[in-house]
């Protein structure tokens, strides 16, 4: 009996020592699922070669794309470049390093061949795209073989996948034509479920079971409510996605799995996308010494309102950025410094602009500090000089004291001026609107506001460019890139606006008439709209998008990135959309 007990103990100890780490089990599941995607794409290729019916092709495409959703959690996390080649937008990409324009590839390109119908004459081109996709999937398989996971990264990836489902999945971002993103989101949830069960390890613990029940509820809701336009995204996010990401966060804490120590736009410790402090403005700045402090904010506010920064002491930043108008001026275009002509573009809001990777409508600078300098030295705007401002400020005892508090290690200098201004602008991102409160479970929406949110993230396709929750063009869930779009904005004479936008910077044809996607936080206060201020009301803006942008107006732009198909919004839906957009107003403006 004694010997038997000793033998049992030895067996248990041996088993524990040789147990496969959970993150390795996750990796094995991931690598196995990659092979399934490769197989499904191979079947699609075979059906194309056999000249199979459109219905069968579409069905197999959806099966293949859904199988990719089973690997997306880990693929997007560890291999973003390969993942983009597999499932990125069907838009050409400009490489800033070498000035080359790369054609799109992957599932979304193939989707355009097969949906809404398939033309057999494009068979050769379609097979070519299938071949490219297959090669990229094999590349994913190859790089995954030597990749090592950790428990911390697995949990980080699972939460990010929930955020990806919210922002890119149920909004239709990666199924723009077939509009099958709702059932495909269920496939993405299934991958989270598989990985989570490995950590739950058949545990009957109530907290583990609660997460699994939430996933089950989510899958059932996604599979039974597949109509893209009718899907209640507000309910799904508040009742399923948010509780799920919170549950994953709590499990990570309970298992004592460390959170990733990394400075990111979306904090690695965020429980949901909509936490009050989910985003880190410092992650969007250049260096640690750019860090925002209360002293810098106070100094920056003084400088912002002081004409000392302009060449003739006649205007300040606040001259064109009025705090009561969410830091716009209500004009189509501001008056130039000469008092006669107009500046080139409409004055944008400064609220909530900190969470972007580029600034100005043409994306010409990367940091708020550089934006401040560009405005100060622009001869039409302030025509100032930081060097001269330093001299002037050193003569003011009050400024000397303020700078000493904000920058105790240095005297007044050019860096201090621009960093203080940028720090003040960063402080203008409050994220305390009714929308934020609604997503945090602290506010209630009326029926029109809920309908408007569901339109914004669904039928109206607003959220495929104005990504929630920031509502700008900074792409979630990594928030590493801010996008520009070609909309075909008209001038006041109903012709294509002559402003070439980002093209002036890159000289790339895909950027002709391209402009950065701005935030629409406080949008009810920031009229007139667009880079040229051509639209006076939100109703006019919605009509423009509803008609298909510039091409809907007959401009025939070859590089328009906005879908030119009409949205067919009803008058009621337009009103509901505006009702939602008004919930994006900061609390101080209520």
Indicate where each model-derived feature is located:
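Post-cleavage N-terminal segment of exported redox proteins
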Residues: 16-21, 218-296, 383, 387, ...
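Sec-exported extracytoplasmic/periplasmic mature domains
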Residues: 42, 46-49, 62-76, 115, ...
């Amino acid at each position: 009996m004694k010997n038997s007990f000793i033998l049992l103990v030895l067996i248990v100890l041996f088993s524990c020592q040789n147990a496969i780490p959970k993150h390795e089990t996750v990796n094995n599941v991931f690598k196995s699922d990659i092979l399934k995607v490769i197989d499904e794409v191979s079947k699609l290729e075979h059906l194309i070669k056999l000249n199979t019916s459109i219905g069968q092709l579409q069905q197999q495409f959806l099966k293949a794309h859904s199988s990719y959703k089973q690997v997306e959690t880990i693929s997007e996390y560890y291999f973003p470049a390969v993942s983009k080649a597999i499932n990125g937008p069907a838009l050409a990409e400009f490489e800033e390093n070498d000035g080359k324009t790369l054609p799109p590839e992957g599932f979304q390109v193939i989707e355009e061949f097969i949906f809404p119908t398939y033309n057999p004459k494009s068979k050769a081109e379609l097979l070519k795209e299938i071949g490219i996709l297959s090669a990229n999937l094999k590349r994913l398989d190859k790089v995954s073989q030597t990749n090592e996971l950790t428990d911390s990264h697995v949990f980080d990836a699972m939460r990010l996948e929930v955020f990806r489902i919210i922002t890119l999945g149920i909004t239709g971002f990666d199924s723009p034509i077939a509009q099958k993103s709702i059932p495909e989101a269920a496939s993405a949830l299934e991958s989270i479920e598989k990985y989570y069960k490995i950590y739950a390890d058949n545990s009957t613990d109530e907290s583990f079971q609660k997460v699994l029940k939430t996933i089950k509820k989510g899958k059932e809701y996604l599979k039974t409510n597949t109509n893209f336009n009718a899907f209640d995204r507000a309910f799904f996010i508040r009742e399923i996605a948010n509780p799920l990401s919170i549950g994953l966060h709590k499990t990570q804490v309970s298992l004592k799995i460390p959170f990733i120590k990394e400075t990111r736009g979306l904090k690695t410790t965020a429980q949901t996308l909509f936490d009050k402090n989910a985003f880190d403005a410092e992650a969007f700045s250049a260096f640690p010494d750019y860090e925002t402090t209360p002293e810098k904010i106070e100094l920056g506010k003084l400088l912002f309102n002081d004409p000392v920064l302009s060449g003739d002491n006649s205007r300040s930043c606040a001259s064109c950025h009025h705090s009561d108008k969410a830091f716009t001026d209500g004009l189509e275009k501001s008056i130039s410094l000469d008092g006669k002509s107009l500046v080139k573009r409409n004055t944008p809001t400064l609220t909530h602009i900190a969470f972007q990777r580029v600034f100005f409508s043409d994306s010409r600078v990367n940091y708020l500090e550089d934006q401040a300098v560009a405005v100060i030295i622009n001869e039409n705007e302030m025509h100032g000089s930081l060097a001269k401002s330093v001299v002037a400020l050193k003569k003011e005892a009050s400024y000397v004291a303020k700078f000493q508090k904000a920058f105790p290690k240095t005297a007044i200098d050019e860096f201090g001026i621009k960093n203080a201004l940028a720090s003040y602008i960063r402080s203008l991102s409050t994220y305390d609107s009714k929308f934020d409160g609604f997503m945090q479970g602290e506010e209630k929406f009326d029926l029109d506001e809920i309908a408007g949110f569901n339109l914004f993230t669904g039928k109206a396709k607003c959220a495929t460019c104005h990504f929630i929750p920031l509502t700008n063009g900074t792409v979630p869930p990594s928030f590493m890139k801010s996008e520009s779009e070609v909309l075909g904005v008209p001038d006041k004479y109903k012709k294509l606006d002559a402003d070439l936008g980002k093209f002036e910077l890159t000289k790339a044809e895909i950027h002709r008439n391209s402009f950065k996607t701005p935030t629409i936080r406080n949008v009810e206060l920031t009229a007139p709209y667009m880079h040229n201020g051509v639209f006076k009301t939100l109703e006019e803006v919605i009509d423009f998008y509803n008609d298909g942008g510039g091409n809907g107006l007959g401009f025939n732009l070859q590089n328009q990135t906005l879908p030119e198909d009409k949205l067919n919004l009803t008058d009621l839906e337009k009103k509901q959309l505006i009702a939602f957009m008004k919930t994006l107003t900061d609390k101080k403006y209520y």
